[in-house]
């Protein structure tokens, strides 16, 4: 009976993977604890064959995927975008209230802020103006899917400063283009 252990485990795992639609050929998966990060090429009784992005091949027993965790990127591939979530740290000592002159300068020099009006009774800070600008800039870009979440938030401050988390979805999900898009966007924010 021990001779057939891998075959039996593979068979049961294969049924679980199929019945629960956990994995299909063509899916991009990553398997923690292994070097598997690529496209599923083949699923057999005893192995799942994955072509990694560096063109190496990984083979993993199906029962490993059922008994441990793995990440299937199919949901991202089939969705309307690929998530970008990064933070920009602001020096806590540079955050200050905006004077009326500062607000007027922002409105004149930054077209996206031309129609900005703070809530009544609120004196905005330069950090708040940056968050408003980031949101308006992202919503103006055709590469950003504004039908999905777009959230600009201030996180708990750290020894590195105050993180402004920028969370949005790129319409383009192709890895190379996705990296270029997010790099271009963050280059703009850094400048």
Q: Which positions does each model-derived feature cover?
A:
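Short, intrinsically disordered, charge-balanced linker/junction segments flanking boundaries
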Residues: 185-191
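Hydrophobic alpha-helical transmembrane segments and their immediate juxtamembrane helical boundaries
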Residues: 1-16, 20
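Short secondary-structure junctions
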Residues: 138-149, 191
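Solvent-exposed, non-transmembrane alpha-helical starts
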Residues: 175-181
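Short, hydrophobic beta-strand segments
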Residues: 161-174
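Short edge beta-strands and adjacent turn/loop segments
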Residues: 148-164
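Soluble accessory domains appended to multi-pass membrane transport proteins
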Residues: 16-131
